[in-house]
UniProtKB/Swiss-Prot annotation:
Residues 708-725 have a biased composition (Low complexity). Residues 683-700, 726-738 have a biased composition (Polar residues). InterPro entries: C2orf78-like (IPR040292), DUF4629 (IPR027898). This is Uncharacterized protein C2orf78 homolog. Residues 324-339, 518-534, 630-640, 809-828 have a biased composition (Basic and acidic residues). The gene is Gm5592. Residues 316-339, 484-561, 619-777, 809-836 are annotated as: Disordered. It holds the Pfam family DUF4629.
């Protein structure tokens, strides 16, 4: 059936059912086939057209070239074609007529057919109507192809005097290659002339593969319901379509998109019902059905994709103005559920004021979870929508709801909505799942707008990372209880993703039970107990080998050696170390925290802040560290961290203030530190420390060398020097724990290659005490090859190198080596365990050789 074929329904009058017959107005003259109408009791493979009774109805011109001019006792069909006017006057036919169409044997898809439709009734006279149409399929004559046009979706003016509150129904089937709808007009009132227009648009068509006559095709039912808007007594139809199939199984089908646009500017009560009644329907792809009401009352549109053929999804309407028919909706719903296993046979319900397939908006909550197990969206009643709009003050977007994962059950979401309704502390709430940036921004915005004491606000960081508390502390006692109950990730929003769960477990692993007690103690203890709690927290933080701030940041601690190299090469702002209260100006993270947060500097904390806070100005960090510094400043102002923490604050939380410092030309050593250090550079940094004798004069006013040592130590997995180093005069025991990683061994300096300037400052601070390498990693010293020339740095090859053949004396040795290698391979194949051992032994030898020559493996 071609999509551009024009057709028009006409309406007859009967006490209960008032069907109509579509006509085709395209006029083409090829050789054609004959379509016969014969009276049958029930519709079989082909369509059933219910014809009107003896009463008459006067209708105006419909659409296109088709006119309906009925008179008393007859039904006149007038079709205007290019050849002329064809009029057919027939009496009423109260029965059902069978319409079969037989195509020609051979042809192409663009072939044309001419049809002669004959209306045959056994009790009345015979009349025929010749209609031509363009078809896109010509099938085998053995297969009876039901042929139906596409209905026009324009409503027409109807004379109200001759329509005494009677229902009208068009009952064709939904057949192959066509789109036909059922129409039911309950209490059809007058439409204003000239303002009718298209209220329904059928987009696309559904095409099925060639099916036999034994397979019953599905039906599409479009039920039109009347509402009475205010101030204007005119009906506006809102569609509710149900998709019912027969008991046969069929291939992949696609339900077309039906879009309803109200052109009269009246508020509809949009009901969209998608009912898939056959569980044998294999893969029914139901596209999105949209109802677009006008923006008069601000009603929001809902879209609902359905992916399971055994579901019944109902999107309840916006609250209409005058609907006294809502009393019968639960009864209709019960009748609908009983008829779900068989196709819709009739729409004959004279006593009901509602269409057959509809649902109650309030009973949607009481559906079991099994009905909603496969839903990709969430059905929400008008009360929830109105409540959310009143609370949010913003538009409720259904696209955010459709992004909810499928494992969220409907009663859980409704309980969440009621919790939100009760909680007056939150001003905005987004019911979405997934780590979208917009959701996080809305969360931060909602928590910033809260009123209360600054110590009552808990960290946003934990909320973003998945610990998710239900309310903000300090707003009410109930919010505090919710926050105490929900730090384990049981937030009312959707389930967190896997990486959030892993990140939460990793950051709770080192802290243990302190993480729960920390949040509650932050809310209840005042600032005057800061000093005692800090003294209690010092030994606990010293026992922690891996601080949890690495996991609280936006990255995880790398597990492989190569990942550690890459991480330290970009120098992502690590914690600065642990607190040591000594008399010299060692920069410790705890002392810096007491200075910036508690406003209670310890001994020597003035020099602490000046030395540490200037480090980003020297360019020791990558260019993205200023952004992290700004984020740290904003987060430190928002959060007001309580001093009663039992662990180090997260990385990036320190408020860094850039101070004026004379040595701003230090980043000149950065290009050498980005790549693996050459032997010449290592020779200058390790063997000749007196070359940096000019640096201590510029660096000594603020004394950053011990600061850099603590920074280097904190950047490593186990910081050894931050808790033991005392000042610029670094002693030999401290140097023995840190300097072998920085100076003597070859592979590890690559690991700390971004700290080249820190290493230089450390060596210049202890320039008179060149440390002897205590226990190097290999048995070969670094000084053995440090002064050797680098052959790949200079090109001294004059020509191509010609290899010399081995001599006769070397030949037996070479053959013996080959035989030994072959024997080793054979043994490895025969004995896998010894082969693996041999592989490890050989790799150990190779590692030793590579470490001797300075290659980090």
């Amino acid at each position: 059936m071609s999509e551009n074929s024009q057709s028009s329904p006409f309406f007859g009058t009967e006490s209960t059912l008032h069907p109509s017959l579509p006509l085709l107005s395209n006029s083409i003259q090829p050789a054609g086939t004959v379509c016969n109408f014969s009276r049958v009791s029930t519709p079989d493979v082909s369509s059933a057209w219910l014809l009107p009774s003896a009463s008459s109805t006067s209708l105006q011109p419909l659409m296109g070239n088709a006119y309906l001019n009925p008179h008393a006792g007859t039904t006149m069909l007038t079709v205007l074609t290019e050849q002329g006017q064809i009029s057919t006057s027939t009496p009423s036919y109260p029965g059902a007529l069978k319409w079969d169409c037989t195509g020609s044997t051979h042809g192409r898809e663009d072939a044309l057919q001419e049809f002669n439709m004959k209306l045959i009734d056994q009790d009345t006279t015979l009349s025929s109507l010749a209609v031509t149409n363009q078809s896109d399929k010509i099938l085998d004559p053995n297969v009876i192809v039901p042929f139906h046009p596409t209905l026009s979706s324009s409503f027409v003016q109807i004379t109200p005097s001759q329509m005494p509150n009677q229902g009208y129904s068009l009952a064709p089937s939904y057949q192959e290659g066509s789109q036909v709808y059922y129409y039911e007009h309950n209490n059809l009132g007058p439409l204003i002339a000239g303002e009718f227009g298209q209220c329904l648009k059928a987009h696309g068509s559904v095409s099925y593969p060639g099916s036999q006559t034994s397979v019953l095709q599905p039906e599409m039912v479009m039920v039109l319901k009347e509402i009475q808007p205010r101030n204007i007594q005119m009906p506006l139809f809102t569609s509710a379509f149900s998709y019912s199939t027969s008991a046969q199984s069929m291939p992949d089908n696609g339900l077309p998109v039906v879009q309803m646009e109200t052109s009269l500017g009246l508020p509809p009560s949009g009901q969209t019902h998608c009912q898939l009644q056959s569980p044998e329907l294999c893969n029914t792809c139901v596209q999105v059905s949209q109802i677009r009401p006008p923006a008069v009352n601000g009603d929001k549109a809902l879209t609902a994709p359905i992916h399971s053929p055994s579901e019944f999804l109902a999107l309840p309407p916006a609250p209409s103005l005058e609907q006294p028919e809502n009393k019968t909706m639960p009864e209709i719903k019960e009748g609908t559920k009983e008829n779900q296993d068989r196709p819709v046979l009739t729409l004959e319900h004279p006593d009901l004021q509602q269409p057959l397939h509809c649902t109650d908006t309030e009973s949607l909550r009481q559906k079991p979870d099994s009905d909603n197990a496969h839903l990709g969206c969430i059905c929400m009643g008008p009360k929830e929508l109105v409540g959310l709009e009143n609370e949010n003050g913003s538009s409720f977007n259904f696209k955010d709801i459709t992004r909810l994962e499928a494992d969220i059950q409907l009663p859980q979401l409704l309980n969440t909505l009621t919790d939100i309704d009760q909680d007056q502390s939150c001003e905005t709430w987004t019911v979405t799942s997934g780590p979208s940036d917009q959701v996080r921004k809305n969360k931060h915005k909602s928590f910033e707008l809260l009123e209360g004491a600054p110590q009552a606000k808990f960290q946003h960081w934990d909320l973003v990372e998945g610990e998710g508390a239900g309310g903000v502390a300090g707003a009410s006692e109930r919010a505090i209880d919710n926050m105490a109950k929900q730090p384990e990730g049981k937030a009312p929003k959707g389930p967190p993703s896997k990486n959030r769960k892993a990140r939460k477990q990793e950051q709770e692993r080192p802290s243990g039970p302190q993480n729960k007690s920390k949040k509650t103690e932050e809310l209840k203890q005042s600032r005057n107990t800061a000093k005692a709690e800090e003294n209690l927290s010092i030994p606990k933080t010293k026992r922690k080998r891996n601080p949890p701030e690495l996991s609280q940041n936006s990255f995880k601690k790398p597990r492989t050696n190569l990942a550690m190299h890459m991480l330290e090469s970009v120098q992502v702002f690590h914690p600065l170390g642990k607190k040591t209260e000594k008399k010299t100006g060692i920069s410790s993270f705890r002392g810096l925290r007491t200075f910036t947060i508690n406003k209670d500097p310890g001994p020597g904390s003035g020099t602490v802040t000046t030395t540490v806070l200037n480090m980003p100005c020297e360019g020791q960090f990558p260019p993205k560290s200023p952004g992290k510094v700004q984020r740290a400043e904003s987060s430190i102002d928002k959060d007001c961290l309580s001093p009663s923490q039992y662990e180090l604050p997260p990385a990036g939380k320190v408020k860094l203030v850039p101070l004026p410092f004379p040595t701003l030309d230090k980043p000149q050593s950065r290009p050498a530190s980005r790549k693996p250090l050459s032997l010449a550079l290592r020779r200058t940094t390790t063997v000749q420390p007196h070359s940096h004798s000019a640096q201590p004069t510029t660096l000594r006013p603020a004394q950053p060398p011990p600061v850099s040592s603590s920074l280097i130590a904190s950047a490593k997995p186990a910081p050894p020097i931050s808790s033991s180093s005392t000042g610029p005069n670094v002693t030999n025991p401290n140097q023995s724990s840190a300097v072998p990683h920085l100076v003597t061994s070859r592979p590890v300096p690559y690991r700390a290659s971004s700290h080249t300037s820190f290493q230089r400052e450390l060596v210049s601070a202890a320039r008179n005490k060149v440390p002897s390498p205590p226990k190097p990693q290999t048995k070969y010293l670094l000084h053995d090859f440090s002064r050797q020339p680098i052959p790949w740095k200079k090109v001294d090859i004059l020509g191509p190198v010609v290899s010399q053949p081995i001599t006769k004396e070397q030949r037996p040795e070479r053959e013996a080596m080959k035989r030994q290698a072959q024997q080793e391979r054979e043994n490895a194949v025969k004995n896998p365990s010894t082969g693996k051992l041999q592989i490890f032994l050989q790799r150990e030898r190779d590692m030793e050789i590579s470490q001797y020559y300075g290659y980090a493996m």
